[in-house]
Amino acid sequence: MHRSAHTDSFARDNLPPQNMWPDIDLSKFDYGPGLNAAVELTDTMVARGFGDNVALIGNGRRRTYKELTDWTNRLAHALVDDLKIEPGNRVLIR
């Protein structure tokens, strides 16, 4: 199993035995052993030219990938710079 940056190991410690895990073939995808879903769902979409496309619809609003990327980057900087959250800490955002 790939090493995790999470400092809280509760979820990993309570997984079922590895022989009970499903077999998932990811060989068709160009991802390394670790995946940052936030980057793939925001920054990568902007980099591929989809920045002006709608990413989210809800509460009567539409957000583009560029807007979503800007918001997540501001949120990440606030968590790290203002609240001193470190990589590996778990955060619940409501």
Regions found by a protein language model. Name each.
Residues V39, D52-R94:
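Conserved AMP-binding/adenylate-forming core of the ANL superfamily
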